[in-house]
UniProtKB/Swiss-Prot annotation:
Residues that hold phosphate according to the record: 103
Function: Involved in 1,2-propanediol (1,2-PD) utilization within the bacterial microcompartment (BMC) dedicated to 1,2-PD degradation by catalyzing the conversion of propanoyl-CoA to propanoyl-phosphate. CoA is regenerated within the pdu BMC (for use by PduP) via this enzyme, although there must also be cofactor transport across the BMC. Directly targeted to the BMC. Phosphate is probably the first substrate to bind in the forward direction. CoA is probably the first substrate to bind in the reverse direction, and might bind to the enzyme as the BMC assembles, ensuring cofactor encapsulation.
Recorded GO MF terms: acyltransferase activity, transferring groups other than amino-acyl groups; identical protein binding; metal ion binding
Full protein name: Phosphate propanoyltransferase
Gene Ontology CC terms: bacterial microcompartment
Amino acid sequence: MDMQQETIERIIRQVLGQVGPAGGSIATLSGDAGVDPFQVAVGVSNRHIHLSRTDMDTLFGPGAELQRKKAMKQPGQFAAEETVTLKGPKGSLSKVRVLGPLRRETQVEVSVADGFALGITPPLRQSGQLDDTPGLTIIGPQGSVTKDHGVIVAQRHIHMHPSTAAKLGLRNGDEVDVEAGGERGGVMHRVLIRVAEASADEMHIDVEEANALCLKNDDVVRICKK
């Protein structure tokens, strides 16, 4: 097979959504990431922050509103134009993206390596589980705020629509294994299933996990039920 023909066939497979794990580029609201119903597209999360209304006012000025930069696959969620600096006991991280919409409580999501750089040890947690977590100082253009908790390393998880969960025999809170193909492929254990009506089927991992398996946004992995 010559190079041109091979390229054409690869493009056709991608368009049809039939590329194997870690080889596709598929985004869907229905969960059909290909012929195999257990396939799901990957979203890679870099460090970011979710802000409360009170902290938004302190950092960006009273009544400030987030400016949309880019829509995310989860309905209603977006990356904002606004960024902040995170300052810990040891160091700081600049240009940390704010994600919208605003939340009830401020939550910072970083990698393990980010924790080393900041001088804190954030635990591996589900989103929203902020008890007994470290804090830091958040610096914005109009002010700063020091939090006594709220920093986590996010547990890898799969957002899933109820119709997909029913089809796969999964429930909210289940944990599954997920297989990634490719030269640096492997199996990720204890991947949390998060089922909600306002969800698009997508697996969320952080940059460290993505780098370890050579995964990027929209690559396709496969759910392996325990």
